[in-house]
Amino acid sequence: MERPALLQNGEHGAVGSLETKTTTRLMPKPFSIESLIATQTPATVSASASIAASPPSPPEDHEQEQEQELSARAMVASSALGLTQFPLYNPWLHGYFAQNHERLTHLIAGGGCYLGSPVGNPFAGKEPSHPHPPPPHALDKSPLPHPLDTRFLPFNASAAAAAASAATPTDLSYRRLAELMNQDYVHNLSVNARLQHMAVAGRLQEDHPSHSLMHLQEPMLLQANPFSPAKSVSHSPVEPTLDVGVDEDYECSGDSSSDISLTLSPMPRNCNRELDKSRNGAYTNSDSEDCSDDEGAHSHHDASGLGGKDSQGNGSGSSSSKSRRRRTAFTSEQLLELEREFHAKKYLSLTERSQIATSLKLSEVQVKIWFQNRRAKWKRVKAGLTSHGLGRNGSASGTKIVVPIPVHVNRFAVRSQHQQLEKMCLSGPKPDLRKKLSTEAMSGFEKFNGGGLGGSAPSSSTASVGAGSVGMGLALGIGVTTPLSLGRSIY
């Protein structure tokens, strides 16, 4: 595998042609570099044999055949030189030479016979004299064969760089050599060799602007390399040409890197948007449904003063979302209607809730949350009254429950509404409020008033509440027009 061995074997150029033909037939059939070179070597051998066996021809034909033979030998020499100077730091090449050392040695020893003749000697095939390899400029100035015949020859980056340094900008043969380098044999090389080849081809693009290399580089980068490992794709030194948006932690195989990267790169952004949309939609739809417990709305009521202003209820959705949702600003008419319905009935059915929401131009969720907050406040007030012992003392001041009114609500409208409620309760309330007061269902305050009446009218809903605990006679005389039914509905 060393170069001196190649040069010594190259001295027997014309003698070893038949041996080359027999040895190359023994090479295996799978797709590899040596099988491709073996398919090209018999063509050159047959060409040299035809030159030796052909009768004398005119000088022009003889010179043309000599030029063809010299060009073929030059390409074989460059191919063998490329085999000896592969970049051995590549992990694929290291394992490749370790497995196929004997086959490559046999191939180079048999097929390197064309290295012995210098390009300038016309009779080099018959009388080998100089065992030195041809210089790079001689390879450039010699006419090259058709690109289809030599497209599978391996690429040598160092030889191409030397040829690029020695060639002039107007050298047509160097352009043809670069075109040969861009053929589809480059798919057999590793990614590092491809990137070196692209660096050499970038110098050529300045000298040859009409021939664009973009259409040659795109299939070369997008097509898969079956021998290249995955790490050479994801960690190559000139990564921006191959990087199309794959994450750094994501590693893919060489045959699917381009397809997967093109389809997976916009995926995280789209997924994040969809997740945010679904998350916000879920919070919007399920915030109000989660707070079914009456006691769960206490914190919102404490923060707002009036729980009916907050329409969304639960704090888990608002804390998860980035921006806090606005509170629903109920109008005075809506608040009055809601208060009236609450005095009439503490718990609404689905039909009643939908009817109230339709009449007030609110959503059913807003009506449900308002009723939950209002019930929570009603329970707190009731618990506060019982803890202070107002029912046991029987003080009349405990019967008046002051509900804080929001600033934007008209206070006169609220007062008139309360007066209407009192009149309605005195004249005849709704059927829900017309309940017979039994001793078991009475609270302590109502039991006290019922005892004060002497049991004369225990079932009357229009009995007056005494201003103080002075006596039983004063309870009827100095009465305040607060019906028991309204007090019972507030409690």
Swiss-Prot record:
This is Homeobox protein unplugged. It is found in: Nucleus. Residues 254-264 have a biased composition (Polar residues). It comes from Drosophila pseudoobscura pseudoobscura. Residues 323-382 bind DNA. Residues 1-23, 46-69, 124-146, 227-329 are annotated as: Disordered. GO terms for molecular function: DNA-binding transcription factor activity; DNA-binding transcription factor activity, RNA polymerase II-specific; RNA polymerase II transcription regulatory region sequence-specific DNA binding. GO terms for cellular component: nucleus. GO terms for biological process: brain development; regulation of DNA-templated transcription; regulation of nervous system development. It comes from the Eukaryota. Keywords: DNA-binding, Homeobox, Nucleus, Transcription, Transcription regulation. Residues 305-316 have a biased composition (Gly residues). Plays a regulatory role in neural branching of the tracheae: segment-specific aspects of these neural branching patterns appear to be generated by homeotic regulation of expression. SUPFAM superfamilies: Homeodomain-like.
